[in-house]
Amino acid sequence: MNDFNKRTEKSKELTDYFVKFLNLNKISYYESGYEFYKDNHNATEKIKFLKDNTSEFIRYYPDFTIVGKDKSLLIETKNSSGIEKKCYNNYLSLVQNLNINVLLLLKNKKLCRLEDLKFSIVNKYDKIVEMNIPVTDKVWKEPRKMNDYEYKLYKKKYKEQGKYTSGCSFAFIDFENTKFYDLKTLLSLNN
């Protein structure tokens, strides 16, 4: 099983929990994230490596579209402690540029509005690999800004520790200072 499939499997727990909640509460939805797409000729595998805006928009599109009585919203499920920078920026663009409602469902099984999301201030030093990792804006770890040798060593050390990293730029979510909402707030969509 490749690393992407391992991550998808981990997120499946939260996704299954969410789908069960939606079904129990008769909330209309459909799975809109690209990992749910049916494809031919390995399209979903190929798109992961494309860097154009359209491909990245598709790759980072939120997992669920919730359809209420008077409005719809998008929800991304994240069963991890962090979020990739490109992913976050795509959601932020949907909110700021298109006035689209985007929520995150995080590993604590709570909802968060993008504008309420807070990030932890991070140190450059990564204890797992015992290396300094470039950091921007005090929150974004940027492993791909290392030179090629350091980056490969970084990935190798993570793997040796039985850990996974995509190597993408990411930030850790500050679960103490982020404002969360109970899943039951979605029930108001049907009123």
Regions found by a protein language model. Name each.
Residues 2, 24, 36-37, 52, ...:
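Non-catalytic C-terminal interaction segments of nucleic acid-processing enzymes
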Residues 29-30, 100-102:
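Hydrophobic anchor at the start of a short beta-strand
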Residues 34-35, 78-80:
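Histidine- and/or cysteine-centered catalytic micro-motif in compact active-site loops
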Residues 51-62:
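Glycine-rich, highly charged phosphate/nucleotide-binding loops
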Residues 106:
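Conserved phosphate-donor
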